[in-house]
């Protein structure tokens, strides 16, 4: 009973208060900043900007704690069964975010809902609940929470577009970093971690819980395919940007000639 109370006080309550406070106060803060800079703050921005900022907060906290948990905290003896207090907290934190985002995206579906996010959030919530909650595959799950490191770049891209800064050099740099981040972390890093467990870890061949092979054989391919789709979409966007810029420069040069 005491353990449950501690979990509520030191994990559930802070997570709930953080996301609730951000949801309540961020729109007002952003509106003040926008008005001071003579930027319109209409309905879409009132909904999307706070949502993106909260997404960024979640990504920074989750990825930073995941890096610490994976590389600066020697607890991983068995990649499929080892757990730590930090890994449990990370899954609790990101679960609260996904629940929050799912509710907000459903309520403001006109602006926020996408089928890709619905699929991603559903798979993530089921994995963190049934695997993470049972103390299974924390190492593998952390390799995914770590890849949230790319999310702030995606949100920055949205902010730059929304502020009409598509021609700013930062927009190009940001797009390239997103592409590299997705390929490096969301595709290769997670795949390398998964293959290491399957082929190099002795615990996989003797694992008896059916959730482990289900995660590796179904969840991992589904998330990877989704990440590959997003990577393709990003690369297509970058290619279109450079092609358009090149054509525009040629048109200007021809006019000058």
From Swiss-Prot:
Bilayer topology term: Multi-pass membrane protein
Lineage top rank: taxon: Eukaryota
Principal place of residence: membrane
Cellular component per GO, a single term: membrane
InterPro entries: TLC-dom, TLCD
TM spans (from-to): 14-34, 53-73, 88-108, 112-132, 169-189, 214-234
Keyword annotations: Membrane, Transmembrane, Transmembrane helix
Single GO biological process annotation from the record: lipid homeostasis
Compartments, as annotated in UniProt: Membrane
Domain TLC: 44-243
Family the UniProt entry places it in: Belongs to the TLCD4 family.
Protein name in the entry: TLC domain-containing protein 4 B
